[in-house]
């Protein structure tokens, strides 16, 4: 009797799932990015500008400081080049791409984060437009770029072509310590009326950066200012690019007046004994995703949420598995029943054929006996010697027919129940083995999802949020200030000092540098 065959349905290989999960985790590693930001106000890099429209060595010091900065150790290096006396800053080194124009332009193949006022170039006039004859006044255009750059493999070119009035250019790639506090004389009470620079800058900046935090620090005693001297001096440290025969120097200083700490709430330009002082608000932009420099703290995941998620997914998947198994079991049982019916029909047909064959053999034997008896009555020998041929006899093999009768039903020889991998079934009934199978599958799936599902969800969520934040927003903002226009404060809860900001015409007489 042949050995019975048993069909096995082994459990799903857990190792394959684990390898697939580890592959997904490896692909979902966060991309390492780094950003360097420019800021306005205190703690900023500056460049000096001389009468021949060339930069002093302070810009080289800025580039060298950036190349050696511990804050941006892996960022591309800066190089400096002069074309017809005008500086060109390339990042990384140039590869045949140069831009010219009357304004500062930014050409990039990678994506900038939070560019200043959402455009490639931006002019912010602190005063009304000056005529061609006002070479000695302080009518300058203030142009600043806030660039939060991440890793890229393209060419980033930052080019300035200075025509007419020289723009105020500030560079800052990392924070530097505050310069030593200068010894300022007592301030004069003759204030030069300022215009709407603070409110203008705050309002336009707030509307341009929906995904960036605006850092505003107006609290005393510290206030940044730019001192205007009426003579040209060379500087080995950082400076600013300003018109001919003028050098602006930026410091964070304190003002000790009789009214307490000086707070530039309504005046932008005021007189001191050595010249005029230009006050700038300490505004900087911070990307919300990298606002905190402290290492991120690890927050313990709620065990209730993790267990609930894992068990819910496990129960759902196990229910699907049991349902599929039940359907497969039902289909296999129906197939076995049909095969048993066909088997019985075939066995019946074979037995009937065997019976008919036995009857034919009996008829043949009877005919042989009759012929032999007839030949002997006539005086001859039997049939075979008379015709001189060997005698043939019909022999029927009944072994296969006997085996057909010993066959068991197909349902007893093929098991439709799940078998253990080691070919033993613990001697349990079918429904008990199916229950153990379901419970074991539920436990394995719950354990698997409890450890790996939160990691996958967190990885996919972070990747989705990163893709959503990578879309650059460049809102076009044009704000030619009207003489009689009003400007809103940045926030409704801003200090009371900002509610008095109103546009006023500058006093052209007091705008000239003091001797």
Swiss-Prot record:
Residues linked to a lipid group, S-palmitoyl cysteine type: 455
Its post-translational modification remark reads: Specific enzymatic cleavages in vivo yield mature proteins. Envelope glycoproteins are synthesized as an inactive precursor that is N-glycosylated and processed likely by host cell furin or by a furin-like protease in the Golgi to yield the mature SU and TM proteins. The cleavage site between SU and TM requires the minimal sequence [KR]-X-[KR]-R.
Q: Where is this site: Cleavage?
A: 301-302
**Alphabetic keyword roster:** Cleavage on pair of basic residues, Coiled coil, Disulfide bond, Fusion of virus membrane with host cell membrane, Fusion of virus membrane with host membrane, Glycoprotein, Host cell membrane, Host membrane, Host-virus interaction, Lipoprotein, Membrane, Palmitate, Signal, Transmembrane, Transmembrane helix, Viral attachment to host cell, Viral envelope protein, Viral penetration into host cytoplasm, Virion, Virus entry into host cell
InterPro entries reported for this sequence: TLV/ENV_coat_polyprotein
Residue ranges, annotated region (Immunosuppression) = 365-381
**Segment Fusion peptide: which positions?**
304-324
Please give the Pfam families that the UniProt record associates with this protein.
Answer: TLV_coat
Signal sequence, renumbered to the chain: 1-33
Per the record, its GO cellular-component terms are: host cell plasma membrane; membrane; viral envelope; virion membrane
Free-text domain note: The 17 amino acids long immunosuppressive region is present in many retroviral envelope proteins. Synthetic peptides derived from this relatively conserved sequence inhibit immune function in vitro and in vivo.
Annotated protein name in UniProt: Envelope glycoprotein
Q: Which gene encodes it?
A: env
